[in-house]
């Protein structure tokens, strides 16, 4: 498990903590928050959908018929299909639903997200992600920081779909904290730092408009406050919390994607008198949840995020 929390206005890192894995055969977590690449899963959806909101291609009220599964490659959802992966499904089976963009993010629907994004240009989405620092080092004072990577999208028929739901991209935990900080602080760039009493982030350049920042924050708050929100376990009286759960299959070197291990996360913000604090909790290779039969970001990482917030901001 690794945890990073930072002040989204100053960039000051408030918490950077890690615990060792019990299975060191596959996981070496020395400075994992800065070095380790992972596919963030649904925590990336706010950016991929946000790129279309910025371009006025969609807004929060656009509605879609959302089935349980969607085929990007013909026949790929058939039980006897053996070709390249081209079938995407929601986490739990459901009847077709009419959902708007706000509800799709609230429920973290993979199929809904793919339907929103699939008529867009993948290069435009990549450019939007790069504005937030994905694909570049954050510059935090930790040796060996990774810059992450993007897939070769022009060679991949399903990459637009997989990128929209947080696959086909490698990120670091610090990159996710930086990206969410830009959303939380009103849309300005941020330099994360382990140093105290920072003034380096004053007058930073604007990455997205204040209006877009506010709209994306409302969508993230609804993930916690909405009746069907995947982050509703984070609700606490007196706190304003927004964020996004993330669940992705763990990639094991030399083996491939695991069917039993998952990188589960919650990345989000808490409003405080000193500005929004942004945090990320990741469980690397999680195999179970203490509160649910399902291994998800909502059932593993979100409870840890909640306990940290209670101690970090106890005066709410």
What is each model feature region?
Residues 204, 296-316:
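Short, gly/Ser/Thr-rich active-site loops of penicillin-recognizing serine hydrolases
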Residues 1-36, 50-287, 297, 301:
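Beta-lactam-recognizing serine transpeptidase/beta-lactamase-like catalytic domain environment
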Residues 290-294:
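Short hinge/gating elements
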């Amino acid at each position: 498990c690794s945890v990073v929390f930072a002040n989204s206005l100053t960039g000051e890192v408030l918490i950077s903590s890690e615990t060792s894995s019990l299975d060191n055969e596959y996981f070496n977590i020395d400075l994992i928050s800065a070095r380790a690449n992972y596919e963030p899963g649904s925590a990336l959806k706010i950016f991929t959908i946000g790129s279309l909101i910025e371009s006025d291609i969609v807004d929060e009220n656009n509605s879609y018929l959302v089935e349980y599964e969607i085929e990007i490659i013909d026949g790929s959802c058939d039980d006897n299909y053996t070709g390249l992966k081209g079938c995407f499904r929601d986490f739990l089976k459901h009847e077709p639903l009419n959902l708007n963009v706000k509800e799709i993010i609230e429920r973290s629907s993979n199929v809904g997200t793919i339907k929103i994004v699939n008529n867009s240009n993948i290069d435009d989405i990549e450019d939007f992600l790069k504005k937030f620092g994905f694909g570049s080092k954050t510059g935090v004072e930790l040796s060996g920081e990774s810059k992450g990577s993007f897939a070769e999208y022009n060679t991949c028929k399903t990459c637009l779909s997989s990128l929209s739901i947080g696959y086909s991209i490698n990120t670091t935990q610090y990159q996710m904290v930086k990206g969410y900080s830009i959303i939380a602080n009103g849309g300005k760039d941020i330099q994360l730092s382990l140093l105290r009493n920072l003034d380096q982030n004053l007058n930073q350049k604007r990455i997205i408009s204040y209006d877009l920042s506010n709209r994306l924050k409302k969508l993230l708050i609804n993930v916690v406050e909405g009746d069907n929100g995947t982050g509703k376990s984070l609700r606490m009286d007196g706190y304003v919390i927004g964020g996004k759960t993330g669940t992705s299959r763990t990639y094991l070197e030399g083996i491939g994607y695991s069917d039993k291990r998952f990188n589960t996360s919650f990345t989000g913000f808490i409003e405080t008198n000193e500005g929004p604090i942004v945090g990320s909790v990741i469980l690397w290779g999680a195999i179970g949840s203490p509160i649910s039969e399902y291994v998800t970001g909502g059932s593993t990482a979100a409870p840890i995020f909640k306990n940290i917030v209670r101690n970090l901001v106890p005066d709410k």
